[in-house]
């Protein structure tokens, strides 16, 4: 193989997602997931050139064993030799990183410094970087960090500050950071292409809807606000996260209900959202499939879409210019026609009129405009964060 490929690593605390992409064509050569780290059933599954495989990693296996298995067992010699750089998804870069960077000792320290804002993710990313250095020592200078928070660093102060004592921001960095930046960036850029608008002129509201969900207001190609905040807990209703709520509810849960801080955190992060509202599941497909026959399903989806529509409406105001499109992406955004329909029905005041046939067709990888002709545009665009990571890595390494 003469082409230069990029290995993409997305390390979680107990898992490792990986892929190998051609950054020019976008062709995916390998994808996979290693999971259940530190447990008796640690395992790995992958798809190489269209063929699937899986294996046990051994009890207690983690990032090191997974990466060693990838290098020694999954990769062919040709594929291994074609890897020219490694791209690392990093959840939090704090205020320091506004774009992707080649990983140096200084960058590693920066990721460590931001770990207090992402205590589950950033330490895992650092493990992934360390293991990548060991597995591919000849590529040490070709490792690149792509930050989830970077795209949102163009937010103005009035958008990222909380109305708390200013010292909390100055001394401790308490502010809005946002997440899903790579996805919001990708679909805003793709919207510009599809609508034949320059990337630095596009005005869109991007809705990344999945188990985690966020909205971003993008004016002239730059993010000016986003719904996730200091952590991914703020904003929209999500699979298991509450999103926005009155902070005094936390005091009530602690002082009156006797719940510990750990119990409250678990409730807000793991037991709320669609799971909390349905009392059945965090899977949006349940609510969509049972919307007409189960009150719990209807309740959950109505709250989800109402919250989403409120954010979209408020972002229309702050963009302050002609809005080119509302973009739906992510697992729910790309596939849940009913979510898009209910949400856009809330926005009829602004002229949005859904085309039922187009909306129903836009799923399972199909994309396109879902609103009626000669009405404001809403469009479904599948996200591809891996491609952004591959392209940024190639740009900084090749």
Curated annotation (Swiss-Prot):
PANTHER family noted in UniProt: ACETATE KINASE
Organism of derivation: Histophilus somni (strain 129Pt) (Haemophilus somnus)
Gene Ontology annotations of biological process type: acetate metabolic process; acetyl-CoA biosynthetic process
Binding, Mg(2+): 10, 385
Broadest EC class assigned to this enzyme: transferase
Pfam families in alphabetical order: Acetate_kinase
Any one Gene Ontology cellular component term annotated for this protein: cytosol
Keywords noted in UniProt: ATP-binding, Cytoplasm, Kinase, Magnesium, Metal-binding, Nucleotide-binding, Transferase
Entry cofactors: Mg(2+); Mn(2+)
EC number: 2.7.2.1
UniProt keyword annotation of Metal-binding present: yes
Family of the protein in this entry: Belongs to the acetokinase family.
GO MF annotation: an example: acetate kinase activity
Xref: Gene3D superfamilies: 3.30.420.40
Cited function: Catalyzes the formation of acetyl phosphate from acetate and ATP. Can also catalyze the reverse reaction.
Name this protein carries in UniProt: Acetate kinase
Lineage: Bacteria, Pseudomonadati, Pseudomonadota, Gammaproteobacteria, Pasteurellales
Residues at the active site: 148
Residues the record marks as site: Transition state stabilizer: 180, 241
Record keyword Kinase present: yes
Stored CDD domains: ASKHA_NBD_AcK_PK
Binding site for substrate: 89
Cofactor note: Mg(2+). Can also accept Mn(2+).
Reaction(s) catalysed by this chain's protein: acetate + ATP = acetyl phosphate + ADP
Record localization: Cytoplasm
SUPFAM superfamilies found in the cross-reference section: Actin-like ATPase domain
């Amino acid at each position: 193989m003469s082409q230069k490929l990029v290995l993409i690593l997305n390390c979680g605390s107990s898992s490792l997602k990986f892929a190998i992409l051609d950054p020019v064509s976008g062709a995916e050569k390998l994808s996979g997931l290693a999971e259940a780290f530190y447990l008796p059933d640690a395992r790995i599954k992958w798809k190489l050139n269209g063929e699937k495989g899986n294996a046990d990693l051994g009890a207690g296996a983690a990032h090191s064993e997974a990466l060693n298995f990838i290098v020694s067992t999954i990769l062919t010699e040709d594929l291994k030799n074609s890897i020219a750089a490694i791209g690392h998804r990093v959840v939090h870069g704090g205020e320091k990183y506004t774009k992707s960077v080649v990983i140096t000792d200084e960058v590693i320290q920066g990721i460590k410094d931001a770990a207090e804002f992402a205590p589950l993710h950033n330490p895992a990313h650092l493990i992934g970087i360390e293991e990548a250095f060991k597995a591919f020592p000849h590529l040490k200078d070709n490792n690149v960090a792509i930050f989830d928070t970077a795209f949102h660093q163009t937010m103005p102060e009035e958008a990222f500050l909380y109305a708390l004592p200013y010292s909390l921001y100055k001394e401790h960095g308490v502010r809005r950071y946002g997440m899903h930046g790579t996805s919001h960036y990708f679909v805003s850029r793709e919207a510009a292409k599809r609508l034949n608008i320059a990337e630095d002129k596009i005005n869109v509201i991007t809705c990344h809807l999945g188990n985690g969900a966020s909205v971003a207001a993008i004016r002239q190609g730059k993010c000016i606000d986003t719904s996730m905040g200091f952590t991914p807990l703020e904003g929209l209703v999500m699979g298991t996260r509450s999103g926005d709520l009155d902070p005094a509810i936390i005091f009530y849960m602690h002082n009156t209900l006797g719940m510990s801080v750990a119990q409250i955190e678990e409730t807000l992060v793991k037991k709320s959202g669609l799971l909390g509202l349905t009392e059945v599941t965090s899977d949006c497909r349940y609510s969509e499939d049972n919307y007409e026959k189960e009150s719990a399903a209807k309740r959950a989806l109505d709250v989800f879409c109402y919250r989403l529509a409120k954010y979209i409406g408020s972002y229309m105001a702050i963009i302050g210019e002609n809005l080119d499109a509302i973009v739906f992406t992510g697992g729910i955004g790309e596939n849940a026609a009913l979510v898009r329909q209910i949400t856009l029905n809330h926005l009829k005041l602004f002229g949005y009129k859904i085309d039922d046939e187009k909306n129903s067709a836009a799923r399972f990888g199909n994309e396109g405009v879902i609103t009626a002709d000669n009405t404001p545009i809403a469009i479904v665009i599948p996200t591809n964060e891996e491609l952004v990571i591959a392209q940024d890595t190639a740009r900084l390494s090749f």
